[in-house]
């Protein structure tokens, strides 16, 4: 178990885990509303990535605290009837997540944790690009 001078890190990780659950749920629900199979597949893929991020953050949390993270609560985000509004909002949220994860990465000392966060923020960048593509379709 690592100790970190910044005791806010475990709380941040729990918050980000909750965000990942909410994001996964949002993309899963959004995917179920679209008619185009390719759009549905992209949205389901993003949802699966968010679930993967949750699991990666869970491992980091457990390594830092020595405790199991049990985050199951999240506030479901409301879907708009207008898919473009959903996509537009999510692009900015994905880009904000990139910044959050990069900041967290710099606060961690273990290389494997930094590698996990690099993968997560790279995925979030890819999500923003995919959502922008869908918006332009």
Whereabouts are the PLM-identified features?
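Non-heme di-metal
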Residues: 1-137
């Amino acid at each position: 178990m690592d100790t970190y001078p910044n005791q806010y890190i475990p709380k941040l990780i729990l918050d980000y885990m909750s965000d990942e659950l909410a994001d996964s749920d949002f993309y899963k629900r959004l995917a179920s509303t679209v008619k185009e199979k390719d759009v549905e597949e992209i949205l389901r893929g993003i949802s699966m990535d968010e679930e993967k991020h949750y699991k990666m953050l869970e491992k980091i949390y457990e390594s830092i605290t020595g405790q199991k993270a049990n985050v199951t609560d999240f506030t479901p985000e409301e879907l708009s009837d207008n898919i473009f509004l959903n996509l537009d909002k999510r692009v900015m949220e994905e880009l904000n997540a990139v910044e959050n994860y990069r900041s967290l990465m710099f606060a961690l000392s273990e290389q494997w944790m930094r590698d996990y966060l690099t993968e997560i923020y790279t995925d979030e960048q890819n999500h923003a690009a995919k959502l922008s593509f869908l918006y332009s379709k």
